[in-house]
A protein has these predicted regions:
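Zn-dependent metallo-beta-lactamase
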Residues: 1-18, 25-28, 94-97, 202-210, ...
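Active-site-proximal beta-strand elements of phosphoester/diester hydrolases
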Residues: 2-5, 19-22, 99-105, 133-139
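Pre-active-site segment of Zn-dependent metallo-hydrolases
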Residues: 12-49, 54-61, 72, 108-119, ...
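Active-site neighborhood of phospho(di)ester-bond hydrolases with catalytic His/Asp-centered motifs
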Residues: 21-23, 40-48, 68-71, 135-138, ...
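Active-site environment of divalent metal-dependent phosphoester hydrolases
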Residues: 27-28, 49-54, 74-77, 91-94, ...
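Glycine/small-residue-rich loop that forms an oxyanion/phosphate-binding "nest" at active or ligand-binding sites
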Residues: 54-112, 117
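Binuclear metal-ion centers of metallo-dependent hydrolases, dominated by the metallo-beta-lactamase
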Residues: 66, 78-91, 174, 178-225
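Active-site-proximal loop/helix segments of hydrolase catalytic cores
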Residues: 112-178
Length: 225
């Protein structure tokens, strides 16, 4: 499996299938790629905020990728001609040779457009099993059931927000990394803007003091596991 970080919370996972998570590309000040360069089978969304929903419609239309997200987001996307599979907390779906399961996150979620309005607390994390197992925590605070997520799904890789302000910060994320106990932890959702500026090396130090194995990626870099 290859995991490529495109900055913020956007990753491309190349396992049994090719998946993009939270495709915030256009307008992302740290993303090194364009929508035109993206070629994926599946779009997986954690929630509806613009810095996560991003280019979902454009990628779905131009690349024919299937959307996996919570029910309300799939309903919205369907109005724009995007084919999707709706899931909800604790449930999941198999597409191709990839299984995606939705798990809780503690945040908020909502979008408004001219033709559709939705606002509600429906954020999520995602367990993506595509050869290896990846836990994308979405935007979230620290919560104790991260221990259960680690125990139940045994992820090979955990993708954790560390930026603070809107999510847990580096200190909280270090504790999350210990609880989840993935083989590799990769920080995300930081340094996109000054308001979520964090030192990833400080996170790495705190997490590794708790027994985690942290790999820091720069936008555009990938790791193979």
């Amino acid at each position: 499996m290859k995991i490529k970080w495109l900055g913020h919370s956007c990753f491309i996972i190349e396992g049994n299938d090719k998946i993009i998570i939270d495709p915030y590309i256009t307008g992302n000040p740290v993303c090194p790629e364009s929508v035109e360069s993206i070629d994926v089978d599946i779009i997986a969304l954690t929630h509806a905020h613009g810095d996560h929903f991003g280019d979902t419609i454009k990628i779905g239309k131009e690349k024919g990728a299937k959307l996996v997200a919570i029910y309300e987001i799939v309903e919205y996307a369907s109005k724009h001609g995007i084919e999707g599979e709706a899931i909800n907390m604790g449930g999941g779906v198999r597409i191709g040779n990839t299984e995606i399961t939705m798990v809780p996150a503690f945040h908020s979620s909502g979008f408004t457009s001219a033709d559709f309005k939705f606002c509600g607390a429906a954020p999520a994390g995602l367990i993506i099993k595509s050869g290896k197992t990846v836990y994308h925590a979405g935007d979230t605070s620290l919560f104790s059931d991260m221990k259960l997520i680690g125990e139940l799904y045994k992820p090979d890789v955990a993708l954790l927000p560390i930026g603070g302000r809107y999510t847990m910060d580096a200190r909280q994320a270090a504790m999350a990394a210990e609880w989840i106990n993935a083989k590799i932890t990769i920080p995300m959702h930081y340094n996109t803007w000054d308001v979520i500026k964090q030192d990833a090396n400080e996170f790495k130090k705190m997490a590794e003091e708790r027994g985690a194995n942290v790999v820091i990626l720069n936008p555009g870099e990938e790791i193979e596991i």
